[in-house]
Structure formats: C-alpha cells, structure tokens
Amino acid sequence: IKEINEALTSMNDSKDSDKGLNYDQNTKEKTTKPSVRYAEGQSMSAIWAVRSLGIDPGTGNELFLTKDGYLTYTWDSDDQIVCGDELPKYTGTFGFNLDWKGFSVNTSFYYRLGGQMYNQTLVDKVENCDMNYNVDHRVYTGRWTTPGQKAEFKKMTDPNYFTRPTSRFVQDLSELQMTSLNIGYDFRNCKFMQ
C-alpha cells in the first residue's frame, strides 16, 4: 500500500478498539485471529501481532515487547508490528507421467516456499479452548503450572481472557502438496478384450 486515506485509518482504529477480539459473522463467536491492517509500505497479507518473548517461567504469563522495546505482561494493540507475511517467496507446480507395460501413473504437485502463517488452530485448541469440551492434550501437558517451569503455553487463567495476536503463533510455512494422482491400466492389449 502506497498511501492510506482516512477511511482506512478509521478501520484500523476501530480494530484497535476491539483489543484484538474479532467476531466471526457466521458463528457469532469471538475470535482472536490477527486483523487485516492498512499501513503505508506494508503488504496486504502482512501478519500483525505483538512481539512475544515467550512464557515467563516465574509467573506463567506471556511476556511482550512493546514498540519502544520495553517488557510488559499487558497485550496492547498499539504494540502490534508486522511479524510475518502470508505471501510465499516461491510457488509453483510440477508433475510427472510414467507409462510401463500398459500401466500409467500421472501426478501433479504444488509447492510454496517461504512465507508465514498465524496458527489460529493452535491458539483456539490450546490457549483459548473451552475446558468443558474435548481439548488438545497440550492443554494439560504443555501449559505452565509451577514457578520456574519452562513452558510453551501460558498458565490457565480466567476463561473469559483470550490470547490475542502474538508472534508466538506466527510460524514459517513451506509445503509440498500432491494435488492429483491418476493410476491406470490400458486393457486394449489384453486377450479377453479382443
């Protein structure tokens, strides 16, 4: 984006006032997926989040880094920065065909290299999960429970508190997908077909 107008600035301000909580129009549920933000010189596929230094072993709370470089336990939408970009550096397709004694195999693949993703599934299934339903085992095994413990996920707190967009859940995404596989046999040369 080269330049933003007042309407886009107003949209950013409106998202900031929601404190990182969004509402899914289809399910009418709260979600904490990073919002699209409009900023001059930034990609439309940029992932905006607050920088995280991980889980504090002493308290079990997430430790954030403000825009000014200060440590804090408080998530603030004003501290969001670009922590990744969903656009991959390289994408492409390739495939191969193989024929042998009447058998044939045709495949095609898609690849993407570089780029990041915000792992919303991990946020929803571990940190923002509803303990009354089936939950990921990491809810019990990966969370902070005692002082001095190094943990991947913060301690269990008030169920109304949601993990907001944080760099802890921005992950590199490179993948290879098999998009099609066709296996065949040519029966025209079989005796029973003649």
Where are these regions (language model features)?
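Conserved small-residue
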Residues: 1-86
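Extracytoplasmic gating/loop element in the C-terminal half of outer-membrane beta-barrel translocons
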Residues: 57, 112-193
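Structural signature of outer-membrane beta-barrel domains
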Residues: 1-6, 101, 112-116, 188
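Generic recognition of flexible, low-complexity loop/linker segments
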Residues: 82-83, 92-95, 189-191
